[in-house]
Each structure stands twice: as structure tokens, then as C-alpha cells.
A protein has these predicted regions:
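Hydrophobic alpha-helical segments, especially transmembrane helices
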Residues: 3-5, 79, 259
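Short, compositionally biased leader-like segments
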Residues: 10, 20-30, 321-335
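Active-site-adjacent loops and short helices of periplasmic peptidoglycan-processing enzymes
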Residues: 20-193, 200-206, 218-221
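Sterically constrained small-residue positions within well-ordered secondary structures
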Residues: 10, 42-44, 64, 257, ...
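Domain-terminus/edge residues, biased toward the C-terminal soluble/receptor-binding domains
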Residues: 172-176, 184-408
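Compositionally biased, proline/threonine/alanine/serine-rich low-complexity intrinsically disordered stretches
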Residues: 19-45, 382, 386-389, 393, ...
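Gram-negative bacterial Sec-dependent N-terminal signal peptides
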Residues: 3-18
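Short, low-complexity, intrinsically disordered N-terminal peptides in bacterial proteins
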Residues: 1-5, 404-407
Length: 408
């Protein structure tokens, strides 16, 4: 019995020791080798006149060539036409239910009897504005673009003035439009960067108008035509935006895709074929999504600091950014971002809400990659007479101490 008890105790002790032996921690997941290497060059389209990849969130051009060179926009012009229509609709100047007439001028200049793309609406046929716009966007109808321009502004020339005004407003600095459809015309020019700015603006400002770009085919009367953006069939993350082709412009494509929370915009101008512009755009999208990511660093209106305020009713003021601060970074390098705030050492009331008080800067490996003004998130009124007097004495005393310390 004693032997059996001793054996039991020994086994129990051994079992306890075994149970208490710590389990080895799993090996740390190795970082991808590519996280520590330079980003490979973007797959530059070999035969394009100009191209780029833009991060939608920040507007940063991640890669490109000849991005500011003048190019013929061809039918990508119709994105500008869509923007103008959406803006005028938002302002109450036109409605989606307006009946738009396919005038004889629109039909003869851009209809089925021409060599260009057409919507299929018959001469003198009326259709709701939104349907005419889909005929322009999906089928790239030159006739629909003219009819819409006539409805919104009275003539193509007047509509072109609106196009140029809105282009300037959204930051297109090197573009000039003379027609709503993009057929070759003297002085009708843009750049790859400006087109990306335009695409980004349409997606951001008028998502419903942008949504027409993902329609794969449209039927008008007896005619069904496909969207010429081949990426709509090849990549489910692609949801727009517009193709273009003339003999002068070559084959062009502005595309946009969203994967997770990240969206990119690509522009390929002056390519050699319908298929090649799609292949090149797909390669650029894949490269951008693989090697870059977008981050929202700070929300608009969220306090980032509360510096001291002298001579005010309040002794502090909350500061933050007025619009979200976004940044594009190479994948795997987000943790290496370093933020700093530049604020005056002394703030005095009164301070107005929204008043710029300083800057927030974000650096990656010592290079500034994003910055934004720091503004007051609330107003601070002047304090009473005695508080202002007291704070003046304290400030004088603080300055005196600082000067004395400097002398020592």
C-alpha cells in the first residue's frame, strides 16, 4: 500500500510538472520581404502618350508619366459633361425628369449617320434627362451629349463655358473644352492629371451620376450597345469610369476600382487598341492596390490638442482639422508615420471658430507626406477686464523669466 501511494504521488507530481510546463510561443510571423525593399516601378504602358495612378482618398499621384502633358481627351470629355449636368441639377437648374429633345443638330452632328458613337435616340425624339445621360455615358453617344448641352445651356458653345468654369472650380488647371462630346477640335485639350482630378471629383461630389458608368449595356429602341470599358467584365472591383477614342487621341481609358476601403483612379491616354488600354489599366490598378494603402489619420472636428489661451473667457481652446487628414503610404509602413504639431507658444483671445492657429504635419522616414491647418474648434471670447489685466502681468512675468534665463 505504501509503495502504491508513493507511486501515485510521484505520478501526480510528474503530471503537475508536465501541466505547468509553458507552451512554447509560436514563431513571430515574418514580415514580407517586400515591406523592406523599394517599391517596384509601376508597369508603365509601353505605347501610351501619358498615364498615371492616383489614390482617390488623398489625390496623390502614386506613379505616372507625362501627367501634365497636353493630350486630346476624346470621349472622356463626357465625364466633364456629366459633372456639369450633375452640378446644375444639384443647383436646381435642371431636373432628372426634364424631357430632353434629340434635336436635328444633335442627331446630324453626332447620331447614327456619323462615324462616331451614338445613343440610338431618333431625331426629334424626347427622353427624360437621366435616360439621355445614360445614353451618353454607357453608349458614349455624341448625339446625346449635344442634346444635353443644348438643354442645359442652349448651345454647345454656351455649355463649353460651363465646362471650363466647373473645371477651374475643381482644380483642373491645364484643360480647355470647346464641345461636350470630345470629337477632335482645336483648343480642346486636357492632361492625365486633370482627368484624374475630374474623375475623383465626380465620384466624390455626385455618386449617383458616377454610378451610370458601371452599367454594362443599354438598350435604346431596338438597339442594345455595350459599355466599351472592358474592365467592367474583367475585374469586379472596377465600377467606372470612361473610355475614349479618336484617330488623334488614340485609345484612352480612365478607370476606377475599389477594393475594401481603398479606391484608385487610373488614366491611360493614347494607347494602341481597345484591349491594350484595358490590359494596361488593369496592371496599373493591381500595382497600386498591391503596394499602397490609404489611411484616415484624423477626423474633422476631433480635438487633437488643447493649448492654453491668455486673456480669454476660457483658458484653453480645442484645435483640430476642418477636413479629414488622409495619407497614402507604401504597404507595411503605416507604423513609421510620425506626426507633429506647430502651434504658437502663446495664444491670446479673442479666437474665432475655424481660425487657423497652426499646422499638423505627418512624416514618413523624415519626408513630409501629409499636412493640414490646425483650426480652433470653438470660439474663445475675451475675458473680463481684471482677467485680462492679470494675464497681462503673468505674461510679462513669464517673458521676464525667459529673458533672465537666457542671460544666465
Amino acid at each position: 500500500m505504501r509503495l502504491r501511494s508513493l507511486l501515485f504521488v510521484a505520478l501526480a507530481t510528474a503530471g503537475l510538472a508536465f501541466a505547468q510546463t509553458p507552451v512554447p510561443a509560436p514563431a513571430a510571423k515574418p514580415a514580407a520581404l517586400s515591406d523592406n525593399l523599394p517599391i517596384p516601378d509601376a508597369p508603365a504602358p509601353a505605347t501610351s502618350k501619358a498615364w498615371l495612378v492616383m489614390d482617390y482618398a488623398t489625390g496623390e499621384v502614386l506613379a505616372g508619366e507625362n501627367v501634365d502633358a497636353a493630350v486630346d481627351p476624346a470621349s472622356i470629355t463626357k465625364v466633364m459633361t456629366s459633372y456639369v449636368i450633375a452640378a446644375e441639377m444639384a443647383a436646381g437648374k435642371v431636373k432628372p425628369t426634364d424631357q430632353v429633345m434629340m434635336s436635328e443638330n444633335a442627331w446630324r452632328s453626332g447620331g447614327a449617320g456619323t462615324d462616331g458613337s451614338y445613343s440610338g435616340f431618333e431625331v426629334n425624339q424626347a427622353a427624360p434627362l437621366v435616360e439621355m445621360e445614360k445614353g451618353m455615358v454607357v453608349q458614349s453617344g455624341n448625339d446625346a451629349a449635344i442634346a444635353l448641352a443644348e438643354h442645359v445651356a442652349g448651345s454647345e458653345a454656351a455649355f463649353a463655358q460651363l465646362m471650363n468654369a466647373y473645371a477651374k472650380k475643381i482644380g483642373m488647371t491645364r484643360s480647355h473644352f470647346v464641345n461636350p462630346h470630345g470629337l477632335t477640335a482645336e483648343g480642346h485639350v486636357t492632361t492625365a492629371r486633370d482627368l484624374a482630378i475630374l474623375g475623383r471629383a465626380l465620384i466624390r461630389d455626385f455618386p449617383e451620376a458616377y454610378s451610370y458608368n458601371k452599367i454594362k449595356e443599354l438598350t435604346v429602341g431596338p438597339i442594345t450597345q455595350p459599355n466599351r470599358n472592358l474592365l467592367l467584365w474583367r475585374d469586379p472591383s472596377v465600377d467606372g469610369i470612361k473610355t475614349g477614342h479618336t484617330s488623334a487621341a488614340g485609345y484612352c481609358l480612365m478607370a476606377s476600382a475599389k477594393r475594401g476601403e481603398q479606391r484608385l483612379v487610373t488614366v491611360v491616354m493614347g494607347n494602341t487598341s481597345e484591349n491594350q488600354r484595358a490590359v494596361d489599366s488593369q496592371a496599373l490598378l493591381n500595382w497600386g492596390f498591391r503596394f499602397y494603402e490609404s489611411h484616415k489619420l484624423y477626423e474633422a472636428g476631433k480635438p487633437l490638442a488643447q493649448p492654453k489661451v491668455w486673456k480669454g473667457e476660457a483658458n484653453q481652446v480645442a484645435v483640430g482639422v476642418s477636413v479629414p487628414l488622409l495619407v497614402s503610404t507604401p504597404r507595411g509602413k503605416y507604423d513609421r508615420l510620425k506626426a507633429s504639431m506647430d502651434l504658437p507658444k502663446s495664444l491670446e483671445a479673442p479666437i474665432a471658430k475655424g481660425q487657423k492657429l497652426g499646422m499638423v504635419k505627418v512624416a514618413l522616414d523624415g519626408k513630409i507626406v501629409a499636412s493640414a491647418p490646425l483650426v480652433a474648434l470653438q470660439a474663445v471670447e475675451e475675458g473680463g477686464f481684471f482677467k485680462r489685466l492679470w494675464h497681462s502681468l503673468l505674461m510679462w512675468w513669464a517673458v521676464g523669466l525667459t529673458g533672465a534665463a537666457a542671460v544666465r
